[in-house]
């Protein structure tokens, strides 16, 4: 176990002192150009300013978010805790698709939100022994340095690096979890841990901690009686912090939305013959424009496939008499964008397509206008308003004359959700509380007309969804995805005439 002696670091200077043991001086390795820059031999498990100066600015731990902001998040959480308490968060493990084929790593987002740590097989503990916030202890248990493993899997920051880079007060090898954790639990009265976690129930560390706390395994022998401990969930408490975005978070999300929106415009200007090609095109544009990856598995649904809300097969042929519904966006620095657009494969709306599309767009426009804190609307209030608006639009189209119709059948999903590190950020946040300044929500009404004889033939097998990301202000709002065109005249102009603005390819410094 290592214990921090030096004060908490909010710049990369102490990181440089640490790594000067490996390289001296660091400056001799730096270059003014990306192409000629010599790699600095710093052994860390994720990008740092020293290794990726074009991606991470000095003082930042992750793109756009400083070490100071991560520290402030931990302190805000500690302020809500009683003395003699600890929060335990189990990070995610590498997940395998088949045999040795693994999925890209995705960190448990509560742990990431509080630490910026993006390496697998780790546990974070935030301990508050007294009333004084200055006594708060930030523990990290992480994979130790291992030359053999790092040769095959990549560098690790290690037990020392998690202190010097990520400001952990105390750190230890994750291999010592069974000895380390009982000591902390024994000396605290309140244990905050999500026993019923749905985010990482397969994590080996989660299972170990759970068995320690519920007595289901043999790992609790080193514990004093757990019966006199109060065990409470923590994710809902963290969710209340996560739902209000800082200016830095909003800046990242605005950039992710901008890149994603411009990528959609690039797609509008091309004709595609199959869903997988359009899927791949958008993926390339998100990454080339500066995002890290897709924010989620995209929906690329042509024709009747669009009637499935979360269709992700993306393997069908696209015909000119159909529309395609795409729900896709990029992620930057861990923060998601979320965009849905629907457009005709032919490049021009038919009269029926135009009428249905305008109905959805009218509802979306009116709902976005409600996204101000001063209106005192909740997300549920906006949803109820969208139902009323959609009923009127359907009546205008004559669909109210269809026997047995109801708006819930044709518009079966919710108007939107919170957005952030998770694409649904975070489910535990109430839909019924008034929206607050700094929240980011999606507004995404939709219409899905089934292939049933009771509906006019020209409307059947058409699914339309239009979605944007909206940041709540006091008396205004900001559309974070405004670049993605959606007005019919604008769409047809791009589809038929292309784009006049150049898309910035192969971005290395998105922020």
From Swiss-Prot:
Residues given in the record as Mn(2+) 1 binding sites: 338, 417, 444, 467
One Pfam family, short name: AMP_N
Entry keyword set: Aminopeptidase, Hydrolase, Manganese, Membrane, Metal-binding, Metalloprotease, Mitochondrion, Mitochondrion inner membrane, Nucleus, Protease
Catalysed reactions, semicolon-separated: The enzyme cleaves the 36-Pro-Pro-37 bond of cysteine desulfurase (EC 2.8.1.7) removing three amino acid residues (Tyr-Ser-Pro) from the N-terminus after cleavage by mitochondrial processing peptidase
InterPro entries: Aminopep_P_N, Creatin/AminoP/Spt16_N, Creatinase/aminopeptidase-like, Pept_M24, Peptidase_M24B_aminopep-P_CS, X-Pro_dipept-like
Enzyme Commission number, as recorded: 3.4.11.26
Binding site for Mn(2+) 2: 327, 338, 467
Annotated compartments: Nucleus; Mitochondrion inner membrane
UniProt KW Metal-binding keyword: yes
Membrane topology: Peripheral membrane protein
Annotated S-S bridges: none
A GO term for molecular function: metalloaminopeptidase activity
Textual note on the cofactor: Binds 2 manganese ions per subunit.
Cofactor(s) annotated in UniProt: Mn(2+)
CDD domains for the chain: Prolidase
Major localization class: nucleus
Keyword Protein biosynthesis included in the entry's annotation: no
GO biological process entries: protein processing; protein stabilization; proteolysis
GO cellular component: mitochondrial inner membrane; mitochondrion; nucleus
Family: Belongs to the peptidase M24B family.
Note, other: Present with 5080 molecules/cell in log phase SD medium.
Protein task: Aminopeptidase which cleaves preprotein intermediates that carry destabilizing N-ter amino acid residues after the mitochondrial processing peptidase (MPP) cleavage site and is thus critical for stabilization of the mitochondrial proteome.
Protein's name according to its UniProt entry: Intermediate cleaving peptidase 55
Organism placement in taxonomy: Eukaryota, Fungi, Dikarya, Ascomycota, Saccharomycotina
């Amino acid at each position: 176990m290592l214990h921090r002696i030096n004060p908490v670091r909010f710049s990369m200077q102490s990181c440089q002192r640490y790594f000067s043991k490996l390289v001296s001086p660091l400056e001799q390795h730096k270059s003014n150009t990306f192409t000629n820059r010599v790699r600095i031999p710093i052994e860390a498990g994720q990008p740092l300013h020293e290794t990726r100066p074009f991606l991470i600015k000095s003082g930042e731990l992750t793109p756009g978010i400083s070490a100071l902001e991560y520290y402030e998040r931990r302190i805000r959480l500690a302020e809500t805790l009683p003395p003699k308490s600890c929060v335990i968060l189990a990070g995610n493990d590498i997940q395998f698709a088949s045999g040795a084929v693994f999925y890209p790593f995705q960190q448990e987002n509560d742990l990431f939100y509080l630490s910026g740590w993006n390496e697998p097989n780790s546990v974070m503990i935030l301990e508050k022994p007294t009333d004084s916030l200055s006594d708060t202890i930030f523990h990290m248990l992480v994979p130790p340095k291992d030359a053999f493993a790092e040769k095959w899997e990549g560098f690790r920051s290690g037990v020392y690096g998690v202190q010097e880079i990520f400001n952990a007060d105390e750190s230890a090898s994750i291999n010592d979890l069974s000895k380390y954790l009982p000591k902390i639990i024994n000396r605290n009265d309140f244990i905050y841990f999500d026993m019923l976690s749905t985010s990482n129930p397969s994590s080996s560390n989660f299972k170990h901690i759970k068995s320690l706390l519920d007595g289901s395994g043999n790992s609790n022998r080193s514990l004093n009686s757990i019966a006199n401990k109060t065990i409470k969930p923590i994710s809902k408490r963290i969710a209340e912090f996560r739902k209000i975005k800082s200016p830095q978070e909003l800046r990242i999300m605005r950039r992710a939305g901008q890149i994603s929106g411009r990528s959609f415009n690039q797609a509008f200007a091309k004709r595609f013959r199959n869903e997988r090609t359009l899927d791949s095109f958008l993926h390339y544009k998100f990454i080339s424009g500066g995002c890290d990856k897709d924010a989620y598995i995209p929906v690329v649904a042509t024709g009747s496939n669009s009637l499935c809300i979360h269709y992700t097969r993306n393997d069908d042929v696209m015909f000119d008499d159909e529309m395609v519904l795409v729900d896709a966006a990029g992620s930057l620095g861990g923060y998601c964008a979320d965009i849905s657009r629907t457009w005709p494969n032919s490049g021009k709306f038919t009269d029926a397509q135009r009428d249905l599309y305008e109905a959805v767009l009218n509802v979306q426009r009116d709902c976005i206008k409600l996204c101000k804190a001063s209106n005192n609307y909740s997300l549920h209030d906006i949803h109820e308003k969208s139902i009323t608006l959609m009923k009127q639009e359907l009546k205008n189209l004559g669909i109210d004359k269809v026997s047995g119709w109801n708006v819930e059948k044709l518009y079966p999903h919710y108007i939107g959700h919170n957005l952030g590190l998770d694409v649904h950020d975070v489910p535990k946040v109430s839909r019924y509380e008034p929206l607050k300044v700094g929240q980011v929500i999606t507004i995404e009404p939709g219409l899905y007309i089934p292939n049933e004889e009771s509906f006019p033939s020209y409307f059947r097998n058409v699914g339309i969804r239009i979605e944007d990301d909206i940041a709540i202000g006091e008396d205004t709002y900001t559309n974070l995805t405004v670049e993605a065109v959606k007005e019919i005249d604008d769409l047809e102009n791009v589809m038929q005439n292309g784009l006049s603005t150049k898309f910035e390819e192969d971005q290395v410094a998105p922020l």
